[in-house]
């Protein structure tokens, strides 16, 4: 059987045209990663999420076009990835409700964004939930639905988003426990060394500091902004330090290794700041100019972007629709004729079955176990490297029973003869139940 590709999912909140720091730190490496063999990539415009903070329809509409055009102009290939708009997948909102109904309020109370809003209100002497809408509170459930609708294995996130991936895992595990193994437990993929660029004033390039260089700034504006980069007072002919130089750091992000070495030597030889800025402009514009032309074309022809997003939505829904159909059946939203045929399969009968539990321990490893209806441990795995490995092992045991138990022996704690017999009996029960559905 061919190995299933690792599925990655990346959400992009529509927030306007990116700047050079966004491009070098996140967009360029993310697009390069889509060319990795053995990976299946999903990129989506998180316009539902944008509604939590923005109630300006014109801005939502404009920013969605700008960010979609930006990613496409920078090289995101819709033939190699599934690129879609969140609001074009109605199954996401249906799944959000299914997940809402198995998510404890206490879990959502602990979400960092919600707690931060409450802490801010407390410091200001306001009601704890002042200004907090239900969208912010339910954000983790919608994010879980974004991930689970495609059973993504890995979700690239910053450290501030790790908790949301862990919450998605908890929600998926709760649903699996109640209704059977429908979801892969996702894993956060944290980039430890994200490149950050210095802005015009030497601080980290950020819209909040008003020190950014827009990614697709016209050549004249780009040259003017580069000319305003803060430098020290060292005169031409006076050696200059590359360390701490915002100009040099920007140059490094766009130049070849040979060019970087030459610029470092030029610093040591006392290059004039004006000449250094001319070199920086030429270096950046060389990479950005072709992308700028594509961006301007896409912005002038939004129908091209819309067609790409609709094609992506069609690809995405080819996976989402059958999954939600299975989930509707699993939770009991079926045709009445189906219900009549299945009256003997009550919830109590389902809960009387053995079940698999999948979880992560503090050692970072992933584990699964088989327990009977009373919670007695029948089978315990050893630590596995990924949730995907655990999910595959569970699927093998559910489908192949005794054969899988023998094949997976190196991944399972040793069993006595009596324990093996109990485990085999439990697996047979699960197979019989699955065959009768």
Residue ranges and their predicted role:
Residues 94-97, 110-123, 127-178, 184-200, ...:
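Classical nucleotidyltransferase
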Residues 163, 172-363, 373, 377, ...:
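Conserved nucleotide- and phosphate/pyrophosphate-binding catalytic cores
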Residues 365-370, 397, 426, 430:
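Short, structured motif recognition centered on aromatic/hydrophobic residues
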Residues 376-387:
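A short, exposed loop/beta-hairpin motif centered on an aromatic-Gly-Thr core
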């Amino acid at each position: 059987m061919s190995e299933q590709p690792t599925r990655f999912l990346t959400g992009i909140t529509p927030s306007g045209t990116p700047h050079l720091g966004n491009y070098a730190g996140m967009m360029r490496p993310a697009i390069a990663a889509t060319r990795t063999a053995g990976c299946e990539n999903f990129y989506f415009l998180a316009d539902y999420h944008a509604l939590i903070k923005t109630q300006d329809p014109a801005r939502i509409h404009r920013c969605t076009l700008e960010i979609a055009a930006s990613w496409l102009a920078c090289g995101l290939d819709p033939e190699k990835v599934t690129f879609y708009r969140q609001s074009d997948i109605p199954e996401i909102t249906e799944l959000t409700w299914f997940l809402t109904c198995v998510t404890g309020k206490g879990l959502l109370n602990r979400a960092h964004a919600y707690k931060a809003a409450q802490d801010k209100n407390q410091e200001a002497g306001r009601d704890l939930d002042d200004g907090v809408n239900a969208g912010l509170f339910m954000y983790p459930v919608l994010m879980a639905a974004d991930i689970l609708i495609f059973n993504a294995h890995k979700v690239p996130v910053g450290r501030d988003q790790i908790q949301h991936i862990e919450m998605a895992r908890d929600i998926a595990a709760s649903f699996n426990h109640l209704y059977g193994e429908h979801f892969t437990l996702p894993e956060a993929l944290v980039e430890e060394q994200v490149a950050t660029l210095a802005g015009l004033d030497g601080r980290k390039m950020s819209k909040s500091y008003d020190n950014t260089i827009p990614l697709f700034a016209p050549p004249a504006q780009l040259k003017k902004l580069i000319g305003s980069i803060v430098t020290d007072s060292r005169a031409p002919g006076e050696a200059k330090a590359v360390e701490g130089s915002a100009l040099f750091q920007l140059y490094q992000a766009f130049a070849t290794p040979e060019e970087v070495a030459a610029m470092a030597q030029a610093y040591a030889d006392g290059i004039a700041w004006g000449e250094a800025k001319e070199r920086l402009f030429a270096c950046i514009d060389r990479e950005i100019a072709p992308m700028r032309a594509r961006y301007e074309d896409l912005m002038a022809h939004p129908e091209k972007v819309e067609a790409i997003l609709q094609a992506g939505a069609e690809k995405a829904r080819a996976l989402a629709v059958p999954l939600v159909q299975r989930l509707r059946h699993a939770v009991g939203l079926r045709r009445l004729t189906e219900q009549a045929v299945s009256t003997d399969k009550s919830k109590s009968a389902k809960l009387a079955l053995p079940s698999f539990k999948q979880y992560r321990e503090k050692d970072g490893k992933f584990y699964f176990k088989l327990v009977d209806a009373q919670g007695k441990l029948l089978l315990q795995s050893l630590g596995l490297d990924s949730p995907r490995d655990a999910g595959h092992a569970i699927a093998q045991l559910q489908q192949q029973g005794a054969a899988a138990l023998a094949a997976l022996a190196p991944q399972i704690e040793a069993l006595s003869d009596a324990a093996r017999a109990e485990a085999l009996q439990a697996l047979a029960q699960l197979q019989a139940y699955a065959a009768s559905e």
